[in-house]
UniProtKB/Swiss-Prot annotation:
Function: Resistance to kanamycin and structurally-related aminoglycosides, including amikacin.
InterPro entries (alphabetical): AGP_Transferase, Aminoglycoside_PTrfase, Kan/Strep_kinase, Kinase-like_dom_sf
Residues passing through the membrane, by range: none
Enzyme type, top EC level: transferase
Keywords: Antibiotic resistance, ATP-binding, Kinase, Nucleotide-binding, Plasmid, Transferase, Transposable element
EC number: 2.7.1.95
UniProt-recorded Gene Ontology molecular function terms: ATP binding; kanamycin kinase activity
Pfam families: APH (PF01636)
SUPFAM superfamilies reported for this sequence: Protein kinase-like (PK-like) (SSF56112)
Protein name, UniProt field: Aminoglycoside 3'-phosphotransferase
Amino acid sequence: MSHIQRETSCSRPRLNSNLDADLYGYKWARDNVGQSGATIYRLYGKPDAPELFLKHGKGSVANDVTDEMVRLNWLTEFMPLPTIKHFIRTPDDAWLLTTAIPGKTAFQVLEEYPDSGENIVDALAVFLRRLHSIPVCNCPFNSDRVFRLAQAQSRMNNGLVDASDFDDERNGWPVEQVWKEMHKLLPFSPDSVVTHGDFSLDNLIFDEGKLIGCIDVGRVGIADRYQDLAILWNCLGEFSPSLQKRLFQKYGIDNPDMNKLQFHLMLDEFF
């Protein structure tokens, strides 16, 4: 994400009337990094007031914002997350207002302090093990491959998959080819844990050298642990193959399952 401006200053958007009173006096910036389909704003600069984030979704994206609110409520018992300040749902829109976790994303920290890469990866691995150790029986959300494949197929059939955003290994592939090659990697035995669903460097927040929380939890649910490992491994590839290798070592996997890894990377292309 280093090639784009991460946010852009903007004017206050038109808001649901129930939010108006709380948000006067803030400066506004629109996020350019998130790929959820929702519009995300950072609210800052109001004297004696906390920094906030506001996420807005319309249509089907409103359902995604609602999913995130529900998962934030549940996961906060186990992991450090933003706090919900306000949630509004109408037939067409959803608004989710949360506190901001102070600090910088793991991506930003790796860019600014490349010599700290090993320490950063170690912290990521420990945090991920903590998430994956939450008892599956406590999780009410399903995100297994059957569920995700159904979502992926629906997105493909409705023309919602952006082939121009595929990883370099699949650059120029039609969506149908990714679908076909992905299915060649099935079946495999699932190793189900509670997953984040989009465990990328931009969704993990560091402050003063410590990993203090995660954001964008709308895909949290029970799935194979490689759902998270694959996405994080892929992100680390932007920095160094040695960091990719270290991730598995510190997580506790001596021999990574490359079949599962590739399956989940292909699956992620549909979202």
